[in-house]
């Protein structure tokens, strides 16, 4: 991620934290725009989740259409996001379509009449404050095939995503959902 984009991201996150709510979705939308442009994906291919107050589930903050669909149990053995929390480490999977995983969230339409393609490639990184995981950020590439989805994610991009997660942490820690 360019220094300019990182600085812009930090500015938006600082503003969200000042406002005292990680659920300022206008601000969060701007963060997602910056992240999606950096990785060359569509905004709906960026997911930001926060851990619920009882430390049992992950709840989507973005994409907005997944907020009310459901939550991911942290005990789930098939959810990459839950594994990211449990193992406290980022991960990249460039063959995600063939990895057993829960696809319930992939079935949610991205627009009223538009179904999303399957996730082919994905990066997942924990969001932590003082070493306590408070959420997960994921960036995916969707398509009918891995080739159609675009280039593989690199380990450098995974490091960038981890840095983005670190930058988002102050805002997510203040989210009413995370308290």
Protein language model annotation of sequence segments:
Residues 135-179:
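Juxtadomain coupling helices with adjacent low-complexity linkers
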Residues 15-19, 29-41, 49, 83, ...:
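Amphipathic alpha-helical regulatory segments at dimerization interfaces
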Residues 59-61, 66-106, 113-115:
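Regulatory sensory and allosteric helical modules in signal-transduction proteins
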Residues 1-26, 174-179:
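Signal-transmission linkers at sensory-effector interfaces
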Residues 33-36, 46-72:
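GAF sensory/regulatory domain recognition
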Residues 120-129:
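A short, aliphatic-rich beta-strand micro-motif
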């Amino acid at each position: 991620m360019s220094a300019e984009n990182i600085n812009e991201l930090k500015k938006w996150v600082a503003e969200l934290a000042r406002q005292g709510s990680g659920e300022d979705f206008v601000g969060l939308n701007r963060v997602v725009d910056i992240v999606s442009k950096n990785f060359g994906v569509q905004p709906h291919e960026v997911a930001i989740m926060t851990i619920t107050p009882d430390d049992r589930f992950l709840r989507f903050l973005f994409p907005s259409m997944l907020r009310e669909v459901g939550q991911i149990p942290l005990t789930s053995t098939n959810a990459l996001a839950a594994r990211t929390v449990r193992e406290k480490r980022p991960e990249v999977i460039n063959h995600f379509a063939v990895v057993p995983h829960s696809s319930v969230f992939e079935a949610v339409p991205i627009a009223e009449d538009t179904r999303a393609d399957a996730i082919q490639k994905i990066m997942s990184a924990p969001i932590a404050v003082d070493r306590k995981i408070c959420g997960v950020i994921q960036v995916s590439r969707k398509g009918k095939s891995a080739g159609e989805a675009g280039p593989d994610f690199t380990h450098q991009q995974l490091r960038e995503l981890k840095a983005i997660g670190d930058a988002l942490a102050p805002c997510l820690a203040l989210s009413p959902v995370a308290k």
